[in-house]
Amino acid sequence: MARYRGPVEKIERRFGVSLNLKGERRLAGKSSLEKRPYAPGQHGQRRSKISEYGLQLREKQKAKFMYGISEKQFRSIFQEANRLEGNTGELLIKLLERRLDNVVYRMGFATTRRFARQMVSHGHVLVDGKRVNIPSYMVLPGQKVEIREKSKNNPQVQRSIELTKQTGIAPWVDVDQAKVFGIFTRLPEREEVVIPVEERLIVELYSK
């Protein structure tokens, strides 16, 4: 299944929760979810009862849309989490948080993961001084992530940095906003990752 490229706010309305797919609009109170807190379509205001499988699938879909990855990528990350020793659900979230596009987002250099992914793909991001244009690159604790010199004054990047003064920065990264770089200091604890996803249901889905 390819990555979704349609209207992102319809996705949030479908699930009834904010996935921060339109970061600045959400902060300004202009997201369509706040205006119309029900699913899109003729019968959107009716919430039908969801089966156990439906709930499990829903959680997987939320995680996929939130992190902006395809089914193939998501399954691959899950398989890696399942291979490692420990709580598979928590390991899944930690692996998702290590993706370079997500780290750029968590450091506050992009208002959304989608913009962060574009920044990485277009070669605007360096890891330990070397350009990396693969959004799925797994960042290791201690690695330095920065916006390349020519892109540091990009209006969208600067706007993103300003907005982090309202939202704050993830506690597992150390950021120098003036120099537009950060250090991925450690893996996050599960309780630190505030996302509307019950990873336990995803594990149950893939365990069938």
Curated annotation (Swiss-Prot):
Domain S4 RNA-binding span(s) in chain numbering: 98-161
One annotated GO molecular function: rRNA binding
A GO BP annotation: translation
Keyword Cell wall biogenesis/degradation: no
Record Gene3D superfamilies: Ribosomal Protein S4 Delta 41, Chain A, domain 1, RNA-binding S4 domain
The entry's keywords: Ribonucleoprotein, Ribosomal protein, RNA-binding, rRNA-binding
Ribosomal protein among keywords: yes
Region (Disordered): 30-51
Similarity field: Belongs to the universal ribosomal protein uS4 family.
Identification of the protein by name: Small ribosomal subunit protein uS4
UniProt source species: Wolinella succinogenes (strain ATCC 29543 / DSM 1740 / CCUG 13145 / JCM 31913 / LMG 7466 / NCTC 11488 / FDC 602W) (Vibrio succinogenes)
